[in-house]
Structures are given as C-alpha cells and as structure tokens.
Amino acid sequence: MVEIKSCCKSFGSHCVLQDVSLPIPDGKIVGIFGASGIGKSTLAKILCGVLRPDSGEVCLDGKLLVSGKTSYDRRRGLAIQMVYQQPYASLDPSQKLGAGLRELIFYHRLAADRKEADRLVQEILSQMQLSAEILTHLPRQLSGGEAQRAALARCLLLKPELLILDEATSMLDVSTQANLLALVKAQMLPRGGSVLLISHDRALTDFYCDSVYEFDEEHRLKEVRR
C-alpha cells in the first residue's frame, strides 16, 4: 500500500499542494480529478521521486519512501511507475522499441541472457496487444495508441506495486482509451497492484475507480466518492 501523508509543496510563493493525504490500497484503482495546474501532476512527480515535498511524507508498505527531510529511496521507488500524457516522453526517440525494452530488462537484471530477455519482451508485447514488428520501429513511427501501450509495457516489465496514469488516456479516442484501461486492470489488479488514475475528467474517474478524490481551489485533496 502506498500512502501520502500531509504533503505540502510550493514553488516560490505559489502553493501547489496543501496538506494532502491519500491512501492507495493494494488491488484498487484510485482516481484524482481537478482543473489543470491544480496540483495533480505535482503529486504524481512526488510519488515518483521527481520532486520532493516541502513537508509530509510518502510511505510504501509502511516504510518511508520520501519526506521533506529525506531523499527519495530509488531502489524501493522502482515499485512506483508512471505513464505520462505524452507517451513519446518515455521513449528514446533514437532507439528502436525492441532495443529499448531489452536494455531496460538487462539494466534492472530481469533476465540472465538474451534468450530470456526476448521471452520477456514477447510476453509483454502479447499482454499489451502489440505486434512483434513494432520492435523494429522508432517511437515516431508508432501511432498514439501504440506509443501509449509501448510506454505502458516499459512500466509493466518492472511489475510495479503502483502504476500512475497521469492524463495518460486524455489524447486517445474513447475506444482506445477503454482498451488501454482494460489492459491496465488485467495486468495490475489480479496480482495486488494498485493504480492511480489522474484526470481532468470526473466521468472517467467515476467510471473506472474504486474511490475518487478532487483537488479543490485551495489545492487540498478531498474524497468525493468511496
């Protein structure tokens, strides 16, 4: 379980997060919605270690992951992965998809040799409903839906405990959006993983999430549906 406790974050005199607390239980989808610039992505970046809170803390399975006084525990932080609104930001523009996936596998020691790495690549492609031919493609050669599933594949290879979707479906059509979220549920929830779905769309979070929170104008987070 991931838990955010009383986190605050400001940039200069501009408060972005004000005493934000949020439990993300195992095996659940938690939704956050709110206007652009209200603090949703800032919270996601704190969870991933891109930003540090000014105060408060984030815990993973009851153990401190980051606080206003401690650096991000990057070894344990691998348990939290994020898919961005722009999938191409997660993909090396000069590297073919297959090479990128194998590099990720060897970097994190997920396989002992090329044969095992190739098996893992084929397995994740099948799970993401991607054809093997895209392994020879550069990111710019992928459609928006393919690029988003490729970015998702990179995250799921690491078998995260928490997957954050930061407006990750906002640029997709309704059918592709539904397909992507179905893939996420199938890969994360059965093994006890959790999902944080961040969106400006209240209807999306209401439909897919077990609990829903809203950022108000004071940059506080309040539960609106359980």
Q: What do these predicted regions represent?
A:
Residues F33-A35:
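The feature captures the beta-strand-to-loop junction immediately N-terminal to the Walker
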Residues L65-Q81, Q95, A99, Y107:
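ABC ATPase NBD coupling module
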Residues K115-E133:
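Conserved ABC ATPase "signature" region
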Residues L138-L142, E146:
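Conserved ABC ATPase signature
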